[in-house]
């Protein structure tokens, strides 16, 4: 199996080094193409349409850093760096959870969405932490979770988001929705001496879905789809609102 690894925390992060070790369990060939700096929060954004150039630095035969976003890295890996299409894309291991609205902001998720858009099975992995990051649960359980996911498979337009709890005792695996944060949580601004501001965002969760299960000590697996369309609302609007809008172009 050929595996492409990327992330949003940067080429030198501990998480990507760990993911390389995890991938050794089932990969015949491992490629790493990751941002040269921390690009957390980049989502599925692209630098290449607006930058005149993007740098690619080769560190070893199959390891590269890129002066772009996680999604840029996947595109560059598939179209420039790799000589074969990977069988699987792994993104992470992210420092911190990817649940609730984080899924929309996450470069870890954005990278695998870029892979799924090209019909490549793609998994994002994240390690929850509180005060200090502890990779133990990822080290122990990631190889098993990845192997099981590859075995059962999933639709091409879906990515898998896996979160490992910070709790020492893992209770098991739960398939769960992403959950919700109170996005209007406390956002504080602290002015720095140079006139810039430091931001701190404290958000409360709804107590549902993946967020709650992680707190209880479960590994969570959340299928995330590329297509954001709400088909129930779309069909309702087609049936009940079409007449209201029919005269706009007259």
Curated annotation (Swiss-Prot):
Gene Ontology molecular function, alphabetical:
3'-nucleotidase activity; 5'-nucleotidase activity; exopolyphosphatase activity; metal ion binding; nucleotide binding
Q: Which cofactor does it need?
A: a divalent metal cation
Question: What protein name does the entry list?
Answer: 5'-nucleotidase SurE
| PANTHER family, sorted | 5'-NUCLEOTIDASE SURE (PTHR30457), 5'_3'-NUCLEOTIDASE SURE (PTHR30457:SF12)
Give the reactions, separated by semicolons, that this protein catalyses. Answer: a ribonucleoside 5'-phosphate + H2O = a ribonucleoside + phosphate
Of the GO CC terms on this record, one is: cytoplasm
Cell compartment(s), UniProt:
Cytoplasm
Q: What does the Swiss-Prot or TrEMBL cofactor note state?
A: Binds 1 divalent metal cation per subunit.
Which annotated residues bind a divalent metal cation?
A: 8-9, 40, 94
Gene expressing this chain: surE
Root EC class: hydrolase
Q: What is its main location?
A: cytoplasm
Q: Which InterPro entries match?
A: SurE (IPR030048), SurE-like_Pase/nucleotidase (IPR002828), SurE-like_sf (IPR036523)
Source organism per entry reads: Wolbachia pipientis wMel
EC number(s) per UniProt? Answer: 3.1.3.5
Identify the keywords attached in UniProt to this record, alphabetized: Cytoplasm, Hydrolase, Metal-binding, Nucleotide-binding
The record's Pfam families line, in alphabetical order, gives: SurE
Q: What does this protein do?
A: Nucleotidase that shows phosphatase activity on nucleoside 5'-monophosphates.
Q: Family assignment? A: Belongs to the SurE nucleotidase family.
């Amino acid at each position: 199996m050929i595996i492409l690894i990327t992330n949003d925390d940067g080429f030198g992060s501990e998480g990507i080094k760990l993911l390389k070790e995890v991938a050794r369990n089932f990969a015949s060939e491992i490629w790493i193409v990751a941002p040269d700096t921390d690009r957390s929060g980049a989502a599925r954004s692209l630098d290449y349409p607006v930058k005149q150039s993007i740098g690619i630095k080769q560190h070893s035969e199959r390891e590269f850093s890129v002066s772009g976003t996680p999604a840029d890295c996947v595109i560059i890996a598939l179209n420039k760096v790799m000589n074969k299409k990977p069988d699987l894309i792994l993104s992470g291991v992210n420092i911190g959870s990817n649940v609730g609205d984080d899924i929309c902001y996450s470069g870890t998720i954005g990278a695998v969405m870029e892979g799924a858009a090209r019909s490549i099975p793609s998994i994002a992995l994240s390690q929850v932490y509180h005060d200090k990051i502890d990779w133990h649960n990822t080290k122990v359980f990631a190889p098993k979770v990845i192997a099981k996911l590859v075995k059962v498979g999933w639709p091409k337009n879906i990515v898998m988001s896996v979160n490992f709890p910070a709790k020492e005792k893992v209770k098991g695996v739960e398939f769960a929705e992403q959950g919700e944060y109170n996005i209007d949580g406390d956002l504080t601004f602290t002015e720095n001496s140079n006139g810039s501001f430091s931001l701190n965002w404290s958000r409360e969760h709804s107590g549902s879905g993946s967020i709650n299960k992680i707190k209880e000590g479960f590994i969570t697996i959340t299928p995330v789809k590329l297509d954001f369309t709400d088909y129930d609302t779309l069909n309702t609007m087609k049936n009940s609102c079409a007449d209201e809008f029919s005269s706009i172009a007259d």
